[in-house]
Amino acid sequence: ESPACNPYSTEDLANGGNGYLPITLQYRPYTAKKAREVSIAGGDFRENFTNRSYLGKTNTAYNEADLDNILECRRAMGDKPVIVCATVNNPMVMHEFEAEADAIIAEFGVSRAAVLDVVFGDYNPTGRLPIQMPKDMDAVEEQSEDRALDMETYIDSEGHNYDYGYGMNYEGVLPAWKK
Protein backbone atom coordinates (compact mmCIF):
# COMPACT_ATOMS: atom_id res chain seq x y z
CA GLU A 1 0.00 0.00 0.00
CA SER A 2 1.23 3.50 -0.69
CA PRO A 3 2.72 5.29 2.33
CA ALA A 4 0.14 6.65 4.77
CA CYS A 5 0.63 8.89 7.79
CA ASN A 6 -1.11 11.02 10.38
CA PRO A 7 -0.49 14.70 9.51
CA TYR A 8 -1.44 15.94 12.98
CA SER A 9 0.25 15.46 16.34
CA THR A 10 -1.39 16.34 19.64
CA GLU A 11 2.07 15.88 21.20
CA ASP A 12 3.48 18.63 18.94
CA LEU A 13 0.57 20.87 19.90
CA ALA A 14 1.08 20.17 23.62
CA ASN A 15 4.76 21.08 23.25
CA GLY A 16 3.99 24.52 21.81
CA GLY A 17 3.83 23.66 18.12
CA ASN A 18 0.82 24.01 15.87
CA GLY A 19 0.25 20.24 15.70
CA TYR A 20 0.72 19.97 11.94
CA LEU A 21 3.18 17.48 10.45
CA PRO A 22 4.22 16.95 6.84
CA ILE A 23 2.25 14.45 4.81
CA THR A 24 4.85 11.96 3.69
CA LEU A 25 4.66 10.05 0.42
CA GLN A 26 7.66 7.89 1.35
CA TYR A 27 7.97 5.06 3.86
CA ARG A 28 11.06 6.13 5.79
CA PRO A 29 11.03 9.18 8.07
CA TYR A 30 10.67 12.45 6.19
CA THR A 31 11.76 15.84 7.49
CA ALA A 32 10.26 18.82 5.68
CA LYS A 33 13.30 20.91 4.75
CA LYS A 34 11.69 22.76 1.83
CA ALA A 35 8.22 23.45 3.21
CA ARG A 36 6.89 26.99 3.38
CA GLU A 37 7.97 28.99 6.43
CA VAL A 38 4.49 30.47 6.60
CA SER A 39 1.45 28.50 5.54
CA ILE A 40 -1.75 30.49 5.79
CA ALA A 41 -3.95 27.43 5.50
CA GLY A 42 -5.14 28.09 9.04
CA GLY A 43 -8.64 29.19 9.76
CA ASP A 44 -10.18 26.59 12.02
CA PHE A 45 -12.12 28.56 14.62
CA ARG A 46 -10.72 26.31 17.36
CA GLU A 47 -7.12 27.29 16.54
CA ASN A 48 -5.52 30.40 17.98
CA PHE A 49 -2.95 30.69 15.17
CA THR A 50 -2.97 31.05 11.40
CA ASN A 51 0.40 29.52 10.46
CA ARG A 52 0.15 25.79 9.79
CA SER A 53 3.74 25.44 8.58
CA TYR A 54 5.46 22.13 9.30
CA LEU A 55 8.92 23.26 8.18
CA GLY A 56 11.61 21.22 9.94
CA LYS A 57 9.18 18.68 11.35
CA THR A 58 9.43 14.93 10.73
CA ASN A 59 6.78 12.34 9.99
CA THR A 60 6.94 8.61 9.28
CA ALA A 61 4.45 6.49 7.39
CA TYR A 62 2.57 4.21 9.75
CA ASN A 63 2.95 1.43 7.19
CA GLU A 64 6.74 1.80 6.98
CA ALA A 65 6.98 -1.99 7.48
CA ASP A 66 5.66 -2.41 3.91
CA LEU A 67 9.05 -1.19 2.67
CA ASP A 68 10.82 -3.59 5.04
CA ASN A 69 8.73 -6.43 3.55
CA ILE A 70 9.84 -5.53 0.02
CA LEU A 71 13.51 -5.36 1.02
CA GLU A 72 13.30 -8.65 2.94
CA CYS A 73 11.55 -10.30 -0.01
CA ARG A 74 14.38 -9.18 -2.30
CA ARG A 75 16.98 -10.70 0.06
CA ALA A 76 15.03 -13.94 0.43
CA MET A 77 14.37 -14.33 -3.31
CA GLY A 78 17.98 -13.87 -4.35
CA ASP A 79 18.10 -13.97 -8.16
CA LYS A 80 14.41 -14.87 -8.55
CA PRO A 81 12.10 -12.11 -9.82
CA VAL A 82 10.35 -9.87 -7.32
CA ILE A 83 7.07 -8.27 -8.38
CA VAL A 84 5.84 -5.43 -6.19
CA CYS A 85 2.10 -4.87 -6.35
CA ALA A 86 1.33 -1.51 -4.76
CA THR A 87 -2.19 -0.53 -3.82
CA VAL A 88 -1.89 3.16 -4.63
CA ASN A 89 -4.13 5.53 -2.68
CA ASN A 90 -2.00 8.62 -3.32
CA PRO A 91 1.25 9.43 -5.12
CA MET A 92 4.29 7.69 -3.70
CA VAL A 93 8.07 8.10 -3.77
CA MET A 94 9.29 5.04 -5.67
CA HIS A 95 13.05 5.38 -5.26
CA GLU A 96 12.98 3.64 -1.88
CA PHE A 97 12.21 0.28 -3.49
CA GLU A 98 12.19 0.49 -7.30
CA ALA A 99 15.74 -0.87 -7.66
CA GLU A 100 14.77 -3.93 -5.58
CA ALA A 101 11.82 -4.86 -7.82
CA ASP A 102 11.92 -6.58 -11.17
CA ALA A 103 8.41 -5.29 -11.87
CA ILE A 104 6.01 -2.88 -10.20
CA ILE A 105 2.27 -3.12 -10.64
CA ALA A 106 0.41 -0.06 -9.43
CA GLU A 107 -3.22 -0.88 -8.76
CA PHE A 108 -5.84 1.67 -7.87
CA GLY A 109 -8.54 -0.44 -6.24
CA VAL A 110 -9.00 -3.34 -8.63
CA SER A 111 -9.68 -6.89 -7.48
CA ARG A 112 -6.85 -9.25 -6.51
CA ALA A 113 -8.06 -11.56 -9.28
CA ALA A 114 -7.46 -8.80 -11.85
CA VAL A 115 -3.92 -8.23 -10.53
CA LEU A 116 -3.18 -11.97 -10.66
CA ASP A 117 -4.46 -12.12 -14.25
CA VAL A 118 -1.74 -9.59 -15.14
CA VAL A 119 0.97 -11.32 -13.06
CA PHE A 120 0.29 -14.73 -14.63
CA GLY A 121 0.00 -13.41 -18.18
CA ASP A 122 -3.72 -13.99 -18.63
CA TYR A 123 -4.36 -10.30 -19.33
CA ASN A 124 -2.13 -7.82 -21.15
CA PRO A 125 -2.22 -4.62 -19.06
CA THR A 126 -3.43 -1.39 -20.63
CA GLY A 127 -3.64 0.91 -17.62
CA ARG A 128 -1.90 4.24 -17.26
CA LEU A 129 -0.98 6.27 -14.21
CA PRO A 130 -3.85 8.60 -13.31
CA ILE A 131 -1.44 10.67 -11.19
CA GLN A 132 2.18 11.77 -11.23
CA MET A 133 4.69 9.89 -9.07
CA PRO A 134 7.10 12.40 -7.52
CA LYS A 135 10.87 12.20 -7.94
CA ASP A 136 11.26 12.69 -4.19
CA MET A 137 9.70 14.62 -1.33
CA ASP A 138 11.47 17.83 -2.41
CA ALA A 139 9.51 17.63 -5.67
CA VAL A 140 6.32 17.32 -3.63
CA GLU A 141 7.12 20.41 -1.53
CA GLU A 142 8.14 22.44 -4.60
CA GLN A 143 5.01 21.77 -6.66
CA SER A 144 2.04 24.12 -6.74
CA GLU A 145 -0.69 21.98 -5.23
CA ASP A 146 -3.40 23.86 -7.10
CA ARG A 147 -1.77 23.40 -10.52
CA ALA A 148 -2.00 20.13 -12.42
CA LEU A 149 0.99 18.27 -13.85
CA ASP A 150 3.71 20.57 -12.50
CA MET A 151 5.64 18.07 -10.38
CA GLU A 152 9.12 16.73 -11.17
CA THR A 153 8.38 13.05 -11.68
CA TYR A 154 10.32 9.90 -10.87
CA ILE A 155 12.48 8.36 -13.59
CA ASP A 156 13.36 4.74 -12.88
CA SER A 157 16.62 2.86 -13.43
CA GLU A 158 15.56 2.01 -17.00
CA GLY A 159 14.63 5.59 -17.91
CA HIS A 160 10.83 5.26 -17.58
CA ASN A 161 9.18 8.50 -16.48
CA TYR A 162 6.36 7.92 -13.96
CA ASP A 163 4.36 10.89 -15.22
CA TYR A 164 0.60 11.17 -15.66
CA GLY A 165 -0.46 8.77 -18.42
CA TYR A 166 2.61 6.49 -18.25
CA GLY A 167 1.92 2.79 -18.63
CA MET A 168 3.38 -0.47 -19.90
CA ASN A 169 2.11 -3.74 -21.30
CA TYR A 170 3.90 -6.98 -22.18
CA GLU A 171 5.32 -5.43 -25.36
CA GLY A 172 6.79 -2.39 -23.61
CA VAL A 173 5.89 1.21 -22.90
CA LEU A 174 2.45 2.31 -24.08
CA PRO A 175 2.38 5.14 -26.65
CA ALA A 176 2.82 8.58 -25.10
CA TRP A 177 -0.24 10.25 -23.68
CA LYS A 178 -0.82 13.68 -25.20
CA LYS A 179 -1.09 16.53 -22.70
Question: Where do the protein language model's features map onto the residues?
Answer:
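C-terminal non-catalytic regions of proteins with extracellular/luminal or membrane-system context
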Residues: 1-179
